[in-house]
Regions:
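Compact, charge-rich alpha-helical regulatory domains located at protein termini
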Residues: 1-34
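N-terminal entrance/gating region of PLP-dependent enzymes' catalytic architecture
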Residues: 29-109
Length: 401
C-alpha cells in the first residue's frame, strides 16, 4: 500500500533541506543547447545494418594463440539455440519455484554435470566468474578453520591474486605467496614451512598460470597433514584427461567456466564454477538448487538451504553473493551434455596435442626456447631472443594474436 505525501509533508521536507519549492530543489542549468545536434539523418534497418558492417570491417580478426587468460573453444550451434528458449532463459534468480521449473531444472542439471566433471560432492548454481568463486572458497575456509591466513602459489593467475587482495583488503585476511621451483611448479619445501606456521587453506592452480602441471596428490597430502584445507583452481576442459579435484581430495575446487560453451567477450559475463565436499555445504555462498516433491508427490525443483544466504540471515550470511550466472551456466550444461565424457576427452586431447605441436615447431627456431621443463596441458611459456613486444606486434601484422 502506497501513501502519498501531503502538502504539509512536502513543505516540511523542503524546509529541512533549505529550499522553498520543488523547482528550486532541481533547478534547470542555465547552459542549454541552442540549435540542432550535429547528427546524420536517420537510417532504415537495411541502411543501418550496412553501416554497422562497414564499421565492423575495420576490426582485424586474428588467429588466437594468446595464453594466460580466457580460452577459445568451438561452441556448437545447438548451445545458443537451446539456451535462448523461453523455458530456460531468465534474467534473475527463480525464487518462485512454481513458475520457474524450467530454470530450476537447468540449474540442477548444471550442478549435477559439474559435480560429475570435478568428482566433487556439491556444486552451487555458479558465481560471477572464476576469481569470485576462488575468493568465496577462501572466505569459507577462513570461517571453517577460524584462521585468517591463506597461502597461494606464485603461479596463480595474477588477476585472481588482485581480486583476492581487493576482497580481503578490509577483512584482516593475511595472503601469503608460496614461491616456485625452477621448473615453474610450487616449491613444496617452502609450502611446508608456511603451512607449519598455520594456515586456513592453500590455493593450488593446476595447470598453473604458466601452463605447468602441479603435483596435486603430493600437495594435497602435505596440506591436509598440516590441518589446512586445499582449494584447487583448475581448467575444466583439462578434466577430460587429467586428474579431477575429487581424486586428490580437494576440499574446494573452483574454475573459470567460460571455455565450456561460452564465447569469448571483452567485459561481458563469464562463469564462476564452485564445488566443495558435502560437509561444507552450510558454510558456502551462492544458490543451491535441490530436487523435492510437490503436494501431489510429483518431482519438483527448488532453491534449498537458503538459511545460509543474505536475504534470510542478512549480516550473518555466509557471503553477500546473492545471484548467479544462470545463462552462462545453462550454456555450460548444454555444452557438456552435447559432448559427453568422450567428447570432452576429445576436446582436452586436441588442446594438449595442438599445444605440444606448437611447442615443438616454435623451438625448432633458434630464437625460441621453452622456459619451464615441467609437463604442461595447453599453455606454455617461451623465451625469445627478440623483445616480446616486438614479436607480438610483428605477429599481429601477420594475422596472429
Amino acid at each position: 500500500m502506497f501513501t502519498s505525501n501531503t502538502k504539509e509533508d512536502l513543505a516540511q521536507m523542503l524546509a529541512e533541506i533549505g529550499v522553498k519549492s520543488f523547482d528550486e530543489l532541481l533547478p534547470v542549468p542555465q547552459v542549454l543547447l541552442k540549435g540542432n545536434l550535429n547528427l546524420p539523418s536517420a537510417l532504415n534497418e537495411q541502411e543501418l545494418t550496412a553501416e554497422v558492417k562497414k564499421i565492423a570491417s575495420k576490426n582485424k580478426p586474428l588467429v588466437n594463440f594468446a595464453g594466460g587468460g580466457m580460452q577459445e573453444h568451438f561452441v556448437p550451434a545447438a548451445v545458443n539455440a537451446l539456451s535462448t528458449r523461453g523455458e530456460f532463459l531468465t534474467a534473475y534468480t527463480p525464487y518462485q519455484a512454481e513458475a520457474s521449473q524450467g530454470t530450476l531444472q537447468a540449474i540442477y542439471e548444471y550442478q549435477s554435470c559439474i559435480c560429475a566433471l570435478f568428482d566433487m560432492d556439491i556444486s552451487n548454481a555458479s558465481h560471477y566468474d572464476g576469481a569470485t568463486a576462488l575468493a568465496e572458497a577462501c572466505l569459507a575456509a577462513t570461517h571453517l578453520k577460524n584462521n585468517k591466513t591463506i597461502l597461494y602459489t606464485k603461479a596463480l593467475q595474477p588477476n585472481y591474486t588482485e581480486v583476492l587482495k581487493t576482497y580481503f583488503k578490509n577483512a584482516s585476511v593475511n595472503l601469503k605467496e608460496v614461491p616456485l621451483n625452477a621448473d615453474g611448479t610450487t616449491d613444496l619445501k617452502q609450502l611446508e614451512t608456511l603451512l607449519k606456521n598455520g594456515a586456513a587453506a592453500f590455493i593450488l592452480q593446476t595447470p598453473n598460470y604458466f601452463g605447468c602441471l602441479e603435483s596435486a596428490e603430493e600437495i594435497s597430502s602435505l596440506v591436509h597433514a598440516n590441518n589446512a584445507l586445499l582449494i584447487a583452481n583448475v581448467n575444466p576442459t583439462s578434466l577430460g584427461i587429467l586428474q579431477t579435484p575429487g581424486s586428490y581430495d580437494a576440499d574446494f575446487a573452483v574454475a573459470e567456466g567460460q571455455g565450456l560453451g561460452n564465447v569469448l567477450n571483452y567485459g561481458g559475463p563469464t562463469l564462476g564454477i564452485f564445488t566443495c565436499k558435502k560437509q561444507f555445504v552450510r558454510s558456502i555462498s551462492g544458490r543451491l538448487c535441490g530436487m523435492a516433491k510437490d503436494k501431489d508427490g510429483k518431482r519438483a525443483f527448488v532453491l534449498t538451504l537458503q538459511a545460509r544466504e543474505q536475504h534470510i540471515r542478512r549480516e550473518r550470511a555466509a557471503s553477500n553473493i546473492c545471484s548467479n550466472q544462470a545463462l552462462c551456466a545453462l550454456n555450460a550444461t548444454i555444452y557438456l551434455t552435447l559432448l559427453g565424457p568422450e567428447g570432452l576427452k576429445e576436446v582436452a586431447l586436441k588442446s594438449l596435442e595442438n599445444a605440444h605441436y606448437l611447442r615443438t615447431e616454435l623451438c625448432k627456431n633458434a630464437g625460441f626456447a621453452l622456459k619451464y621443463k615441467a609437463p604442461f596441458y595447453n599453455e606454455f611459456v617461451v623465451m625469445t631472443k627478440a623483445p616480446a613486444a616486438k614479436l607480438i606486434k610483428a605477429a599481429a601484422k601477420k594475422g596472429f594474436l
